[in-house]
């Protein structure tokens, strides 16, 4: 498949599996799952082997697809609202401040925002006034990241339950607009809690081109099943 594919399945609840293309005849395939699901680290190898055999994944994989290396897993910290952000002249950004999304585990956008906010804070307050710069940075993290983080954590809890997960996907599959913007929202083409923070609203926030592929035939597909993938 030349585009991003995402699968939601009961045994990956509060998580998902993905496929996205890489340069050449290569792709990144994997899954993420929240620790609160009760799945043990030792079980992830079994889930991985089973995942590759599921019909929905087999339909996307090439018949002769082969892994380049052994599969790997690692924990992703997501608690930007609970860690120190500064230590005198040191500002923590990205993973160092656990600025990742608790629903998807993504963190590239958050890392960029936190790094830029730290630089802007120093520029605004001056390098000779670390206390003032720290205060500016703290406010920026709250403005740009904390509300999104808490909103995503709340939504992730809803998705733990079958009724919540099915309801969310049915709503997202209502029409082309909801499908397109669900994909954009899910993978953070705009801030997670944008609709709840009017201070970040801007004209065209839901209608811009976005960081997705548009070939004229649609931009996303949602696969919804009652059985695993």
Q: What annotation goes with each model-predicted range?
A:
Residues 120-229:
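C-terminal helical "tail/cap" subdomain of flavin- and related membrane-associated enzymes
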Residues 4, 100-103, 107, 153, ...:
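Residue-level detector of alpha-helix boundaries and kinks
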Residues 6-38, 92-93:
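Active-site substrate-recognition segment that forms the wall
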Residues 13, 35-122, 127:
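FAD/FMN-dependent oxidoreductases across multiple families
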Residues 1:
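FAD-binding core/adjacent interface of flavoenzyme oxidoreductases
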Residues 33-52, 170-188:
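Short secondary-structure transition/capping segments
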């Amino acid at each position: 498949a030349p585009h991003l594919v995402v699968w939601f399945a009961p045994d990956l609840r509060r998580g998902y599996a993905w496929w996205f293309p890489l340069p050449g005849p290569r792709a990144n395939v994997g899954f993420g799952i929240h620790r609160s699901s009760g799945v043990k680290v030792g079980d992830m190898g079994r889930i991985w082997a089973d995942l590759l055999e599921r019909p929905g994944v087999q339909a996307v994989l090439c018949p002769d697809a082969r892994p380049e290396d052994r599969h790997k897993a690692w924990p992703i910290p997501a608690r930007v609202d609970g860690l120190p952000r500064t230590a005198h002249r040191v500002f923590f950004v990205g993973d160092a401040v656990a600025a990742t999304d608790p629903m998807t585990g993504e963190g590239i956008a958050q890392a960029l925002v936190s790094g830029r906010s730290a630089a802007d804070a120093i520029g605004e307050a001056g390098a000779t006034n670390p206390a003032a710069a720290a205060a500016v940075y703290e406010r920026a993290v709250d403005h740009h990241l904390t509300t999104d983080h808490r909103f995503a954590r709340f939504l992730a809890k809803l998705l733990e339950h079958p009724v919540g997960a099915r309801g969310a996907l049915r709503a997202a599959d209502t029409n082309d607009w909801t499908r397109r913007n669900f994909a954009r929202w899910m993978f953070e083409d705009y801030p997670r809690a944008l609709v709840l923070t009017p201070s970040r609203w801007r004209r065209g926030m839901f209608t811009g081109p976005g960081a997705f592929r548009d070939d004229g035939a649609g931009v996303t597909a949602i696969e919804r099943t009652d059985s695993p993938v």
